[in-house]
A protein has these predicted regions:
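Nucleotide/phosphate-binding catalytic cleft detector across ATP-hydrolyzing
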Residues: 1-212, 232-233, 242, 291-295, ...
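Short beta-strand scaffold segments in enzyme catalytic cores
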Residues: 16-20, 222-227
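Glycine-rich phosphate-binding loop plus the immediately following alpha-helix
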Residues: 36-39, 188-192, 219, 225-269, ...
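A mobile "lid/hinge" subdomain adjacent to the ATP/sugar-phosphate binding pocket shared
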Residues: 254-296
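A composition-driven signal for long, intrinsically disordered, charge-rich low-complexity tracts
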Residues: 10, 17-19, 24-28, 237-251, ...
Length: 380
C-alpha cells in the first residue's frame, strides 16, 4: 500500500511556511529568474537554492535577501521581486513554479535535515511514485478565488530539478500529482484552527475564550475575523486589510531613509537591514542612517493606527480574546498588547505560540500547523 504523505504550505508574501509529516520549515518566498545569470552556472553557490523547470532556472529562498542588498543586483531584479509581493502574484506562472519549488524543497529538506535516513533508498525522494499525496495550501482570505487555477497547475505530472549550492547537489524530480488530494483554506481561518483545534483537527476551543478576534498579520495583508460563542463567523467581520501590513511599514521606512539621503534605498532592502542578518545601518558619504531604528519607530506608529482600525470595526470590550499570529503579528504583538491593556483592559491579547503539547513554537507557523491539522482530519 502506498505511503501517505501529508504536506502543507502557507503561501506568505514574505515566506513559505511548510509542514511535511511533523517537520516545519520556512524560507523566503521570493524567486528570481537567473537563467541567463552567472549565478545559475556557478559551481560553488553556498546555500543558494534553485529550481530548474522547463528550460528556465530560478533562484529562491533566503539567500536572495543578501543578493538584493547590493545596488546593482537590486536594479536588475527589482521589478521581478516587486511582482512577487503583489496580490496578483497568485495568478502568475512564477508563483505556480515557486509553489512547486516549495513542495520539492520540503521533500529534500525532510530527507536531508529532519530525517537523514542512512539508507537513501528509504528517502521520500527515492519513493515519489510510491507516495499517496495529501497537499494543503493556505492563501490570503482575499485571494481564495485564485485556488482553481493554482490547483489546475499543481494537479499534473511535474518534471523539475531542485539544486542546493553546487550542481553536484541536484535532485531530479518526477512528481506526479495528478491523483493527489488537495485542500485549500484561508490563512486566517487555519490560524484559528492552530489555536482552537486538536492535533487531529477537531475543534477543542474553550467556549469561555469566545467571542474572539483572530488576527493574521502578514507581509501584504492583515487578515481579521470575529468568532462568536456559537463558533459562527459573521462575514461582515471578516476582511483583509492592506493598509497596515509589513509591506506598508517597509514602504514608509523607504521614504524616511530616502529623505535622510539614501535616494537609491528600496523597501525590498528593509528586511535585510532591519529584520535580517544585515548591518542595521546604511551610509551616505559620512552620514550613517540607522534603518533598524527607523523601522522600530514606524512599526510602533502603525500598530497604533491598526488598533484604531480595530476599534472602528469591532467592539473590543465585548470580546474575551484577541489571538494574534503571523510574522508581522509577532512584531505588532507587544505594541497591541500595551494599547489594549490601556484602553480595553479586560480583553486578553494572546500570541499564538503554544503547540498542542504546551511547548513554545513560533507564531509564524500557526497557519501551516492549523492547515495541516485540517488536512489530516479531512483525509484520515
Amino acid at each position: 500500500m502506498d505511503q501517505k504523505l501529508y504536506l502543507s504550505v502557507d503561501c506568505g508574501f514574505d515566506k513559505f511556511k511548510c509542514c511535511i509529516g511533523d517537520y516545519l520549515l520556512a524560507f523566503s518566498s521570493k524567486m528570481i529568474d537567473v537563467t541567463n545569470s552567472i549565478n545559475a552556472l556557478s559551481v560553488a553557490d553556498g546555500d543558494n537554492t534553485y529550481i530548474e523547470y522547463k528550460g528556465s532556472v530560478y533562484m529562491f529562498g533566503d539567500s536572495i535577501d543578501q543578493i538584493i542588498s547590493m545596488k546593482s543586483n537590486l536594479k536588475m531584479y527589482a521589478e521581478e521581486l516587486d511582482s512577487n509581493r503583489n496580490k496578483q502574484r497568485f495568478k502568475d506562472r512564477t508563483f505556480h513554479i515557486s509553489l512547486l519549488a516549495a513542495i520539492g524543497y520540503s521533500i529534500v529538506a525532510y530527507d536531508t535535515v529532519y530525517n537523514p535516513e542512512k539508507d537513501v533508498d528509504k528517502h521520500l525522494f527515492r519513493n515519489l511514485s510510491n507516495l499517496q499525496y495529501f497537499i494543503g495550501i493556505g492563501l490570503p482570505y482575499g485571494s481564495m478565488n485564485e485556488w482553481p487555477q493554482i490547483k489546475e497547475f499543481l494537479k499534473q505530472r511535474h518534471n523539475f530539478k531542485i539544486r542546493r549550492g553546487s550542481k553536484s547537489c541536484t535532485f531530479d524530480f518526477d512528481l506526479d500529482l495528478s491523483n493527489a488530494n488537495f485542500l485549500c483554506n484561508a490563512q486566517v481561518i487555519t490560524a484559528f484552527l492552530f489555536q482552537g483545534a486538536s492535533s487531529d483537527g477537531n475543534l477543542t476551543i474553550d467556549k469561555k475564550a469566545l467571542p474572539c478576534i483572530m488576527m493574521d498579520a502578514g507581509y501584504k495583508t492583515v487578515g481579521l475575523f470575529e468568532l462568536a460563542k456559537n463558533l459562527s463567523i459573521n462575514p461582515e467581520t471578516a476582511f483583509s486589510d492592506t493598509d497596515h501590513a509589513m509591506y506598508n511599514i517597509d514602504k514608509y521606512v523607504e521614504e524616511k531613509v530616502k529623505d535622510a539621503g539614501r535616494e537609491d534605498f528600496s523597501y525590498l532592502q528593509v528586511q535585510y537591514h532591519a529584520r535580517g542578518e544585515g548591518n542595521p545601518a546604511v551610509r551616505k558619504n559620512t552620514t550613517v542612517i540607522n534603518v533598524k531604528d527607523i523601522y522600530e519607530k514606524v512599526l510602533a506608529e502603525e500598530a497604533i493606527k491598526l488598533c484604531s482600525l480595530l476599534e472602528g470595526k469591532y467592539s473590543l470590550d465585548d470580546v474575551e480574546n484577541m489571538f494574534i499570529t503571523g510574522c508581522t503579528g509577532i512584531a505588532y504583538y507587544p505594541h497591541i498588547k500595551k494599547y489594549m491593556a490601556e484602553h480595553h483592559g479586560l480583553t486578553k491579547v494572546v500570541l499564538t505560540n503554544r503547540a498542542d503539547d504546551g511547548s513554545e513554537i513560533s507564531p509564524m507557523y500557526a497557519i501551516v500547523i492549523g492547515l495541516h491539522k485540517q488536512l489530516k482530519n479531512r483525509y484520515k
